[in-house]
Amino acid sequence: MERAEHIYQKLVAICGEENVLRDEPMKHHTLVRIGGKADFLVWPETYEQVVDVLRLKEEYELPFTLLGNGSNVIIRDGGLRGIVMQLKHLNRIWREGNNIIAQSGADIKAVSRFALEQHLTGLEFACGIPGSVGGAIMMNAGAYGGEVKDVLDHVKVATLTGELKTLTNEELELGYRTSLISRTHDIVLEVVFALQPGDYGQIKAKMDDLTFQRESKQPLEYPSVGSVFKRPPGYFAGKLIQDSGLQGKGFGGAEVSTKHAGFIINKNNATAADYIATIEMVRKTVKEKFGVELELEVKILGEE
């Protein structure tokens, strides 16, 4: 039996045939609708399956990529080698006291809505963030003055070798769009958010206002990765790009949004090469005009 088939059969034995795909085009699994093929895409249904896949990866010395819901990532056209794991089945959300516990694959927007239903305040800022809970922890996601760091109590993670452990807010070293696990690549399994009782009407009004701001300013009618660049100290990335005259410009099917210059949209079947070339054009032009280096907020993965 060839090695790839052997690995496939082992993955099927762990996760079930319906949860293992071979040579899967990743453009179907990223919000920007871009990306080459993954050798193996797996969707574990339990923490035990996550650990078993990690141990298999170790045994066969396979490359490994954990993907959230594909919101903040560009996968190159050559795709991803080895195993790609998504935790979309691990999506439970529940309440214990004033804490909300969410599994890594849950949508952070769904957790924000659940908090509203439970009359708990603290997660309003997340009502429009397009991402999984695990991804939100890794990036210390934030919007409109709030961030994960403000409400996170602790997380359960699996290390890349399959060891389970708990990390507190302090141990996670949460900073602006970064965390300890963005460097260690530990896999978030479960998250505890510490919230406060609040007034349903006030919580809903704040979420409605943030949703309106987002929908009126962001180009949600086209696929994109969301905000491409981090906020440079003392500036706004979108304003620098706008003042550089780059809106409506790009390569191939990728284009700097005319609605919000901080977004690059997939306007017409863009490839990853189109998208990355557009990013580099923006960075180069802003550096030349304003002397400001734009840092990426998105992750670029895979082979060219």
UniProtKB/Swiss-Prot annotation:
<feature type="active site">
    <location>
        <position position="297"/>
    </location>
</feature>
<keyword id="KW-0521">NADP</keyword>
<keyword id="KW-0133">Cell shape</keyword>
<dbReference type="Pfam" id="PF02873">
    <property type="entry name" value="MurB_C"/>
</dbReference>
<dbReference type="GO" id="GO:0005829">
    <property type="term" value="C:cytosol"/>
</dbReference>
<feature type="active site" description="Proton donor">
    <location>
        <position position="227"/>
    </location>
</feature>
<dbReference type="GO" id="GO:0071949">
    <property type="term" value="F:FAD binding"/>
</dbReference>
<dbReference type="InterPro" id="IPR006094">
    <property type="entry name" value="Oxid_FAD_bind_N"/>
</dbReference>
<keyword id="KW-0560">Oxidoreductase</keyword>
<dbReference type="GO" id="GO:0009252">
    <property type="term" value="P:peptidoglycan biosynthetic process"/>
</dbReference>
<dbReference type="InterPro" id="IPR003170">
    <property type="entry name" value="MurB"/>
</dbReference>
<comment type="pathway">
    <text>Cell wall biogenesis; peptidoglycan biosynthesis.</text>
</comment>
<dbReference type="GO" id="GO:0008762">
    <property type="term" value="F:UDP-N-acetylmuramate dehydrogenase activity"/>
</dbReference>
<keyword id="KW-0573">Peptidoglycan synthesis</keyword>
<dbReference type="InterPro" id="IPR011601">
    <property type="entry name" value="MurB_C"/>
</dbReference>
<dbReference type="Pfam" id="PF01565">
    <property type="entry name" value="FAD_binding_4"/>
</dbReference>
<dbReference type="InterPro" id="IPR036318">
    <property type="entry name" value="FAD-bd_PCMH-like_sf"/>
</dbReference>
<feature type="domain" description="FAD-binding PCMH-type">
    <location>
        <begin position="34"/>
        <end position="198"/>
    </location>
</feature>
<keyword id="KW-0963">Cytoplasm</keyword>
<keyword id="KW-0132">Cell division</keyword>
<dbReference type="GO" id="GO:0051301">
    <property type="term" value="P:cell division"/>
</dbReference>
<dbReference type="InterPro" id="IPR036635">
    <property type="entry name" value="MurB_C_sf"/>
</dbReference>
<protein>
    <recommendedName>
        <fullName>UDP-N-acetylenolpyruvoylglucosamine reductase</fullName>
        <ecNumber>1.3.1.98</ecNumber>
    </recommendedName>
</protein>
<dbReference type="GO" id="GO:0071555">
    <property type="term" value="P:cell wall organization"/>
</dbReference>
<dbReference type="GO" id="GO:0008360">
    <property type="term" value="P:regulation of cell shape"/>
</dbReference>
<dbReference type="InterPro" id="IPR016169">
    <property type="entry name" value="FAD-bd_PCMH_sub2"/>
</dbReference>
<comment type="function">
    <text>Cell wall formation.</text>
</comment>
<feature type="active site">
    <location>
        <position position="177"/>
    </location>
</feature>
<comment type="similarity">
    <text>Belongs to the MurB family.</text>
</comment>
<keyword id="KW-0961">Cell wall biogenesis/degradation</keyword>
<keyword id="KW-0131">Cell cycle</keyword>
<keyword id="KW-0274">FAD</keyword>
<keyword id="KW-0285">Flavoprotein</keyword>
<dbReference type="InterPro" id="IPR016167">
    <property type="entry name" value="FAD-bd_PCMH_sub1"/>
</dbReference>
<dbReference type="InterPro" id="IPR016166">
    <property type="entry name" value="FAD-bd_PCMH"/>
</dbReference>
